[in-house]
UniProtKB/Swiss-Prot annotation:
<dbReference type="GO" id="GO:0051539">
    <property type="term" value="F:4 iron, 4 sulfur cluster binding"/>
</dbReference>
<dbReference type="GO" id="GO:0020037">
    <property type="term" value="F:heme binding"/>
</dbReference>
<feature type="binding site">
    <location>
        <position position="441"/>
    </location>
    <ligand>
        <name>[4Fe-4S] cluster</name>
    </ligand>
</feature>
<dbReference type="GO" id="GO:0019344">
    <property type="term" value="P:cysteine biosynthetic process"/>
</dbReference>
<comment type="pathway">
    <text>Sulfur metabolism; hydrogen sulfide biosynthesis; hydrogen sulfide from sulfite (NADPH route): step 1/1.</text>
</comment>
<feature type="binding site">
    <location>
        <position position="491"/>
    </location>
    <ligand>
        <name>[4Fe-4S] cluster</name>
    </ligand>
</feature>
<dbReference type="InterPro" id="IPR006066">
    <property type="entry name" value="NO2/SO3_Rdtase_FeS/sirohaem_BS"/>
</dbReference>
<comment type="similarity">
    <text>Belongs to the nitrite and sulfite reductase 4Fe-4S domain family.</text>
</comment>
<keyword id="KW-0411">Iron-sulfur</keyword>
<feature type="region of interest" description="Disordered">
    <location>
        <begin position="1"/>
        <end position="20"/>
    </location>
</feature>
<keyword id="KW-0349">Heme</keyword>
<keyword id="KW-0479">Metal-binding</keyword>
<keyword id="KW-0028">Amino-acid biosynthesis</keyword>
<dbReference type="GO" id="GO:0046872">
    <property type="term" value="F:metal ion binding"/>
</dbReference>
<keyword id="KW-0408">Iron</keyword>
<comment type="subunit">
    <text>Alpha(8)-beta(8). The alpha component is a flavoprotein, the beta component is a hemoprotein.</text>
</comment>
<dbReference type="InterPro" id="IPR005117">
    <property type="entry name" value="NiRdtase/SiRdtase_haem-b_fer"/>
</dbReference>
Length: 578
């Protein structure tokens, strides 16, 4: 932290960025993320957290929320909103054992308002609707089965994603181990989590407690992935730091490093935009943790702490220059990036159904619409997964597409597990490829940032899109990558879709077109603030043209660019709002 930063303003490379945001004060005064959270837990007058603690609990993996469906009714009754928390677990690579699954299933059933488990685009699970009296129990339950929620939210490195590829089992295992190492290396070192939630022994904090993150932590959230081409299921360009696995004869030899991706933006603020990550080059395995720390510390020191809307790594690269940032990383890591090794992303969806791995084990990928595991009428999905967990000897793998893989199934167990899955609606041969390639964030009723529906909106919207595709004779395999996010923060990753809807107001969305199937192109806004009916009319007209004018094998997103319907985004800062 520079002297100017200490005096409540920030200067980076000679440029004064301005006074520090209030979040910087909050973190600096938090006593390494402790704040007064413990005192707040004892306050039963309110179901929420007050003042700074509302923000600080994010570093412990929680967001304060309320049920927005009943907010107005409670206000009429002179009641405060139904405050509760959403917890996001830390699960690098998304692997969870059957024993762990049964424990989280039990907690969700007995101690959450909604009784559901939500698989998320961060390749983990979320509990929604946990009331204040149950929060400590929640953390202690997770701790008893070897799970925590440290740093899954807040201005830190979040849950590390890893390609869910059980077919290439040896390579996946190597990549997964690196995802875990990176996660551990970049974790906050403060003991605040154990002290508050696990009744751990209190220790005196020291200046050296956060050697990588610093006492003010990062300027903004930071997301990391480990990805195994040709699968881009983690959507590398949605993340700050990506390690692209490079293999030789099936053995991992190093990584290409991609830095500066991110999708969040702010409506009507042209200084914000989604951005693809830059390719810095190749590194050998032994430099992985050094490079991870160097990227994080460079962003820690150079990221914008004055304006949180411009605080992410993508804006730092555009402000100081990608080459300058890269050179600083090389200096800090003691490495010289080599020329990137060749790789290609050809797909990013999950292979739903059974696949056989090279080790002879079988893996069943279950499509979970929007990641919501709940016992719906006629489709007791949550019970079905629990029943599988009772007999399964392998593990479960949550995917960044919000699906669930039953991994490591011996041939002798296949029929039994499939029977359970079908009986509980977890396997349905009638689910279209279009539905499998559509995704939404949570949005209403629990997300406080949601401007429009997403999860509850998507199922019927997909049905309508399916009808349009059928009407124009589009084959099943030529579906469209379709994503909906309830606000411009981008949790639904709509800014890497062929058709992306971004919530603007209740019942209204911005329509973005021009992404591609591999997730390597940012779509651009086509129509602003339109209704779902208007969106479907637009899609109908576009699909009609696509069906009539497409080149052989041409995907929808590629067609919209070639046909001049939308301009391609090459450089986001220049092109996205042009």
């Amino acid at each position: 932290m520079s002297a100017n930063q200490q005096s409540n303003s920030q200067e980076v490379l000679g440029e004064v960025l301005g006074p520090l945001s209030d979040n910087e004060r909050l973190k600096r005064e938090s006593n390494l993320l402790r704040g007064t959270i413990e005192q707040d837990l004892q306050d039963r007058i309110t179901g929420g957290f007050t003042a700074d603690n509302f923000q600080l609990i994010r570093f412990h993996g929680m967001y304060q929320q309320d049920d927005r469906d009943i907010r107005n009714e409670r206000a009429k009754q002179k009641l405060e909103p139904l405050h509760n928390v959403m917890l996001r677990a830390r699960m690098p690579g998304g692997i969870i054992t059957p024993k762990q699954w049964l424990a989280i299933d039990k907690f969700a059933t007995e101690h959450s308002l909604y009784g559901s488990i939500r698989l998320t685009t961060r390749q983990t699970f979320q509990f929604h609707g946990v009331l204040k009296p149950n929060i400590k129990l929640m953390h202690q339950t997770l701790n008893s089965i070897g799970i925590d929620s440290i740093a899954t939210a807040g201005d830190v490195n979040r849950n590390v994603l890893c390609t869910t590829n059980p077919v290439e089992s040896e390579l996946h295992q190597e990549a997964y181990e690196w995802a875990k190492k990176i996660s551990e290396h970049l974790l906050p070192k403060t003991r605040a989590y154990a002290e508050i939630w696990l009744d751990g022994e209190k220790v005196e904090s020291t200046e050296e407690d956060e050697p990588i993150l610093g006492k003010n932590y990062l300027p903004r959230k930071f997301k990391t992935t480990v990805v195994i081409p040709p699968q881009n299921d983690v959507d590398v360009h949605a993340n700050d730091l990506n390690f692209v696995a490079i293999a030789d004869n099936g053995k991992l030899v190093g990584f290409n490093v991609l830095v500066g991706g991110g999708l969040a933006m702010t409506h009507c603020d042209t200084s914000t935009y989604p951005r693809r990550a830059d390719d810095f080059g190749f590194i050998p395995l032994e430099k992985t943790l050094d490079v991870a720390a160097a990227v994080v510390t460079t962003q820690r020191d150079w990221g914008n702490r004055s304006n949180r809307k411009n605080a992410k790594t993508k804006y730092t690269l555009d402000r100081v220059g990608s080459d300058v940032f890269k050179a600083e990383v090389e200096k800090r890591a003691g490495v010289k990036f080599e020329q990137s090794r060749p790789y290609e992303f050809t797909e990013r969806g999950d292979r739903i159904g059974w696949v056989e791995g090279i080790d002879g084990k079988h893996h069943l990928a279950l499509f979970i619409e929007n990641g919501r595991l709940l016992d719906f009428p006629g489709k007791p999905l949550k019970t079905g997964v629990a029943e599988i967990a009772k007999i399964h000897k392998g593990d479960f793998r949550m995917t960044a597409n919000q699906n669930l893989i039953v991994a490591g199934v011996p041939k002798s167990q296949k029929a039994k597990i499939e029977k359970i899955a079908r009986e509980h609606g977890l396997m349905d041969d009638g689910v279209s490829e279009q539905r499998k390639n559509s995704m939404a964030c949570v949005a209403f009723p629990t997300c406080p940032l949601a401007m429009a529906e997403a999860e509850r909106f998507l199922p019927q919207f997909v049905t309508d899109v399916e009808g349009i595709l059928e009407k124009h004779g589009i084959p099943e395999e030529d579906n469209i990558i379709l994503r909906v996010t309830g606000c411009p923060n981008g949790c639904g990753r709509a800014m890497l879709a062929e058709i992306g809807l971004v919530g603007k107001a209740p019942g209204r969305y911005n329509l973005h077109l021009g992404g591609n199937r591999g997730g390597t192109r940012v779509p651009k806004m086509c129509k602003e603030n339109i209704t779902d009916k208007q969106i479907l009319e637009e899609i109908d007209q576009l699909v009609a043209r696509w069906a009539a004018e497409r080149e052989e094998g041409e995907a929808f997103g590629d067609f919209t660019i070639r046909a001049g319907i939308i301009q391609e985004v090459f450089v986001s800062k220049r092109d996205f709002h042009a």
